[in-house]
């Protein structure tokens, strides 16, 4: 039997068995492409080629793959020669029909882990690509123990193997599968209340929701993060499908017998709670074990508020057979099996720091930490796995029992920018990669040199639900504080809730910033807080906290929510206000960043300043203000507002205004 005949026979067997497989081609670029093109000639199929520079159609870049979700393909090539976009790779695997090959192109096997990975530019906060040895070593370990994955290396012999036969697979007919049918029976008889259906990709979760709508006697409204993602649901719901976006649903008065929320974990929890209060029966569906994030954290946080919640899980794949080798390999390689929280960590707690090197010497421990963090945070994705394994400046702490992980914290080094760059960030001239809190302290705070200090930001922290309220989270922060003696502060950025803020207060943090718009991911205002370590860190925390207190009443009026600090009455302009106003008038600081000082300027100044007063005092929208003032758009409006502030400063103290103007203009010449 020729090689092509053996390939076709194996592919036919895979189709009968309802499975997909991974074939890894390792070698130089031209060899890998030649082999992949030869496979494309030998096997009929779609052969979607995912690469930045593909030699054949159909093709798309890894970044464009999200636009193809919901479609299906037979066979695909994923080019990882220059970089491995893990989310795109996982998404591609989910589009492949039963009987498909996913062909992965990699650099020569021995050189792979030392090669700079272009994808690292998205998550490493480095200006140049970095090598990713821990991730590549992890992939190699997964490949080595997986007998179902095929590996063809340049200059090495290869033949198509024969695999033992599996049971023949019966593809879905469109009727509910046994697992779906059982859940449908429960839902159709369900009294008023909330139900949640969780599933990994390809389990028919959206189909189940559509089947519920088509079979119910009453009416239903469907909502989801995007309508485009509800195509499958709409197909099964038929004529009874009715979609409203979450914000439109909340703004209106529409009602129905059921509210169906598809991918509920991707909708901000406060918004979801408000929606849930309007309907008597609610079905929430969300993905667990996925490249878009995991839903177990959603179940823990959101569903805990509904004590009589009915929970269902779909386990049986619909689009391929149980035990599909490709699904198993992707799940193991990208660690989609997050912590289920089914088993409580028992016994005494031992706190221990570890580094990324542990992925090489003892991978079980960092793997368990990642699974805990993934299970507790909805938005954990393969990008976070890549960062945890190989990004510079990462620090990890675990709270371990004898056999399990009870808690973990992940911190990221920030700051240490040059004085010139920090000043340029403050003035709005630069936003270099990374440094979330350190940059925000400069860009939105009052100290142009704030980003020169060294901080460690708490990126993630989680405690197993069975061990919460024992002080483990606080102890993790205390351990992090003790291990950061050479830093100026610890920092955290989070979606503000009173409950979360109480935790950070107990840890000793000082609130230094509240955002002025709600984050889409949490439905909350962003809060930032510091735990000072050095004297310089203490001075910065005090200065920014006092600034927040001066702005508190103004921010509260703007946000419509109280700021959790003791307000300071301040109607006069101090030195910090003058600096900030100069940064707005003569440089590029944003309008809302300067809300407090601008509001105090309007109180002090008797000039008309229509562009500024219209926005800040009347809360007129940019569009309406442009019409009123005869301006062509938002850019022209911002120019007018900056000009008005410059005019007001000059009127108050011309000499001081010019001196500050000359200073902030110098800051654009950073190095």
Swiss-Prot record:
Binding locations of acetyl-CoA: 461-463, 468-474, 499, 506
Domain N-acetyltransferase per the UniProt entry, residue ranges: 349-531
Name of the protein this chain belongs to: tRNA(Met) cytidine acetyltransferase TmcA
Domain of life: Bacteria
Function: Catalyzes the formation of N(4)-acetylcytidine (ac(4)C) at the wobble position of tRNA(Met), by using acetyl-CoA as an acetyl donor and ATP (or GTP).
Gene label: tmcA
GO biological process: rRNA acetylation involved in maturation of SSU-rRNA; tRNA acetylation; tRNA wobble cytosine modification
Pfam families named among the record's database cross-references: GNAT_acetyltr_2, NAT10_TcmA_helicase, TmcA_N, tRNA_bind_3
Coiled-coil blocks: none
Chemical reaction(s) catalysed: cytidine(34) in elongator tRNA(Met) + acetyl-CoA + ATP + H2O = N(4)-acetylcytidine(34) in elongator tRNA(Met) + ADP + phosphate + CoA + H(+)
Assigned protein family: Belongs to the RNA cytidine acetyltransferase family. TmcA subfamily.
Secreted keyword on record: no
Cell compartments where the protein resides: Cytoplasm
E.C. numbers: 2.3.1.193
PANTHER family: N-ACETYLTRANSFERASE 10, RNA CYTIDINE ACETYLTRANSFERASE
Record keywords, A-Z: Acyltransferase, ATP-binding, Cytoplasm, Nucleotide-binding, RNA-binding, Transferase, tRNA processing, tRNA-binding
InterPro entries, per the entry: Acyl_CoA_acyltransferase, GNAT_dom, NAT10/TcmA_helicase, P-loop_NTPase, TmcA/NAT10/Kre33, TmcA_C_sf, TmcA_N, TmcA_tRNA_bind
Example GO molecular function: tRNA binding
Cellular component aspect of the GO annotation: cytoplasm
